[in-house]
UniProtKB/Swiss-Prot annotation:
Source species, domain of life: Eukaryota
Membrane-related topology note: Multi-pass membrane protein
Name used for this protein in its record: NADH-ubiquinone oxidoreductase chain 2
Alphabetized InterPro entries for the sequence: Complex_I_Subunit_2, NADH_DH_su2_C, NADH_UbQ_OxRdtase_chain2, ND/Mrp_TM
EC number: 7.1.1.2
GO molecular function, one term: NADH dehydrogenase (ubiquinone) activity
GO cellular component: mitochondrial inner membrane; respiratory chain complex I
């Protein structure tokens, strides 16, 4: 993917756009960075010559353009409010800005475009959408102090992200609803501390990369492919099982560490109701991860094995297994490191 010169150019511009947004000291500058990011990400989405990727890029453009328009309008209103002695309600304007940023990040209740769009993307584009494209909106959300709307979005995101993945047969939609659920956890960490949000985002990005990397190299897009996937290779199926559990946040895997930090901070802030909802939603996500892995282990369609033939000694497979090792034993290694300090 990244060996194409045009893709390198657009990826670089996309990164620059995000950095402009993050380092900007005005809403107008942040809007400009978001637009640069948007206009460079669309060519990356629509590069493949198939109908679904073109449709996905159009959906992304329309939703992001709507959010950008609302953000620009609200930014102008804020500038007018500062010049007109606060005759315009600043809290209402900030709420509109928050809604636009939640739409950009794909958080509930503005999530409806996200799973459908994910279905038309390649795995590497889906990974960028789930990780890098969330940095700028979440950083801008951290500048706003509107707890009530953020709390509603957190509750809806964790519930919809958990329940929405229950009846999915597409792995891309499954990862999309998982991303919405994790986004709820990230938004809740934004209410507490920016450093905890960054830690959560880094760990989530790594775990998402491990899974999408595997799905990409083995060309897996639907659940029924997992049933016929390497019947004779129990190691790869076991690694898939462990990575799903780590992404779900089950101890003692690496994915539990960021959730542990969020749980600890929410407990200190006496947010017991929110914490209970978030933990219940995590149990639901772990349930459908376990159901997928149980089916992949127990249901084998031997007549379809020829579809998934690949070189088991490839460098990609070895890299995936190395990353899986850190996904499984990362929490132990980090604990050992701090213990030795």
């Amino acid at each position: 993917m990244f060996y194409n010169s045009s893709k390198i150019l657009f990826t670089t511009i996309m990164i620059i756009g995000t950095l402009i947004t993050v380092t900007s000291n005005s809403w107008l500058g942040a809007w400009m960075g978001l637009e640069i990011n948007l206009l460079s990400f669309i060519p990356l989405l629509s590069d493949n010559n198939n109908l679904m990727s073109t449709e996905a890029s159009l959906k992304y453009f329309l939703t992001q353009a709507l959010a950008s328009t609302v953000l620009l309008f609200s930014s102008i209103l804020l500038m007018l409010a500062n010049n007109l002695n606060n005759e315009i309600n600043e809290s209402f304007t900030s709420m509109i800005i928050m809604s636009a940023l939640l739409l950009k990040s794909g958080a509930a209740p503005f999530h409806f475009w996200f799973p459908n769009m994910m279905e038309g993307l390649t795995w590497m584009n889906a990974l960028m959408l789930m990780t890098w494209q969330k940095i700028a909106p979440l950083m801008l959300i951290s500048y706003l102090n509107i707890k009530n709307l953020l709390l509603i979005s957190v509750i809806l995101s964790v519930i919809i992200g958990a329940i929405g993945g229950l009846n999915q047969t597409s792995l891309r939609k499954l990862m999309a609803f998982s991303s919405i659920n994790h986004l709820g956890w990230m938004l809740s960490s934004l209410m507490i501390s920016e450093s905890i949000w960054l830690i959560y985002f880094i760990f989530y990005s790594f775990l998402s990369f491990v899974l999408t990397f595997m799905f990409n190299i083995f060309k897996l897009f639907h659940l029924n492919q997992l049933f016929s996937w390497f019947v004779n290779s129990k190691i790869l199926k076991f690694s898939l099982f462990m990575n799903f559990l780590s992404l779900g946040g089950l101890p003692p895997f690496l994915g539990f560490l960021p959730k542990w930090l969020v749980i600890q901070q929410l407990t200190m802030c006496n947010q017991y109701f929110l914490l209970t909802l978030m933990m219940m939603s995590t149990l639901i996500t772990l349930f459908f991860y376990l159901r997928i892995c149980y089916s992949a282990f127990m249901l084998n369609y031997f007549e379809n094995n020829w579809i998934m033939e690949m070189n088991m000694n490839s460098n990609n497979t070895n890299l995936y297994l190395i990353m899986t090792f850190f996904s499984i034993f990362g929490l132990f290694l980090i604990s050992l490191f701090f213990f030795m300090l």
